[in-house]
Regions:
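Core beta-strand residues in small-molecule sensory/regulatory alpha/beta domains
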Residues: 91, 119-121
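Generic short beta-strand
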Residues: 36, 117-119, 134
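Hydrophobic beta-strand-centered segment that forms part of the acyl-chain substrate-binding groove
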Residues: 62-113, 128, 135
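Short hydrophobic alpha-helix segments
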Residues: 130-132, 148
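Hot-dog-fold acyl-thioester-processing enzymes
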Residues: 2-84, 139-163
Length: 163
């Protein structure tokens, strides 16, 4: 039996790279170096390591831009910051030795979740984009909880600054 033809989900167009000049001036960015240990034998960034870099950028964003310790929320407040979904579009491979710029934008803030748009740029070319849905949970009950007010306020202020 032949495999069914794969199509994009209804309502989802093929993603195209965005030039960084269209990112908001106040958007938070960080630089990550692609190291030997991040790559497959061909010297191309291994996809799971790309996801690790995205998570590292989010952790850094919390402290550097929101002034809220990611690890404090998890360790001290017992608030989980789990990913409900991560939808990544890869436009070009990332190679060993390259410096990648990760830009984080807030698309939407809900009651229990926030949607991030994370853009990875090499020089002036977007090579990857990830739409990341993060849900706040109680690490005691493992159920979704309302985003804590200080976090929601910080996310809202950042989102507003990027308009």
């Amino acid at each position: 039996m032949p495999l069914p033809k794969l199509e994009l989900p209804k309502g989802r167009e093929r993603a195209l790279p965005i030039h960084p000049r269209y990112f908001p001036d106040d958007a938070w960015t960080t630089i990550r170096m692609v190291r030997f240990s991040d790559c497959d034998p061909a010297g191309i960034l291994y996809t799971p390591r790309f996801v690790d870099m995205i998570n590292g950028a989010v952790e850094d964003f919390f402290l550097a831009r929101l002034h809220i310790g990611y690890h404090d929320l998890i360790q001290n407040e017992r608030i989980g910051l789990g990913y409900k979904s991560a939808d990544c579009d890869f436009f070009k491979p990332a190679l060993m030795g390259e410096r990648l710029q990760f830009t984080i934008l807030v698309e939407h803030i809900g009651r229990t979740s926030v949607i991030f748009s994370i853009h990875c740029v090499r020089e002036i070319e977007e090579i990857m984009r990830c739409r990341l849905v993060m849900v706040t949970t109680s690490l005691n009950t493992h159920n979704a909880i309302t985003i804590p007010r200080p976090l929601k306020d910080a996310l809202t202020a950042y989102k507003d600054s990027c308009r």
